[in-house]
Amino acid sequence: MFKHILFPTDGAMTSKHIISECIGFAKDAGAIVTALHVMPRYSRAYDEEGAQAFRRECVSAAEEFLEEINTVARDAGVPCNPLHATSDYPYDAILRIAEEKHCDLIVMASHGRKGVKGMLINSETQKVLTHTKLPVLVFR
């Protein structure tokens, strides 16, 4: 049914717990996974040295998050393409990458919490749900 899953992550603990869920779903579907981490742009207010240091730190963190997903996928025998992008609007980058990579499903974390906050959905997840034409599977 699904052949190419986009799995965007911000590396937060709330999205880390769904890595195995996403990879398991992909394995059952016989799908490949594109793991995506969207990094913020660095502000022009930084000096050039600060901007470069910020970018290096963001890339390093992205590669760490993506390697964790890639390791779980490799261990499960699921093809995984790690990718990072830069955007001030993560949902926009998610939609763009989903289209560019011809993904047919987006899997995201709800970032739900306990109590009233648990009933709310992450704003980036909500924006993806609102603006995409693709199916979105949201894990809690």
Model-based region annotation:
Residues K3-E49, V72-A76:
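Small/aliphatic-rich secondary-structure junction motif
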Residues T14, P90, K114-V116:
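Short glycine-rich, flexible loops that bind phosphorylated cofactors or substrates
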Residues I18, A45-E48, D92-L95, G118-L120:
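Short, well-ordered secondary-structure micro-motifs
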Residues G24, R96-R140:
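Gly/Ser-rich helix-loop-strand patches that form or flank binding pockets
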Residues V33, C80-P82, V136:
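Hydrophobic anchor at the start of a short beta-strand
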Residues L36, L83-A85, F139:
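Structural motif
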Residues Q52-E64:
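A short acidic, glycine-rich active-site loop
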Residues T71-I106:
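Structural beta-alpha unit
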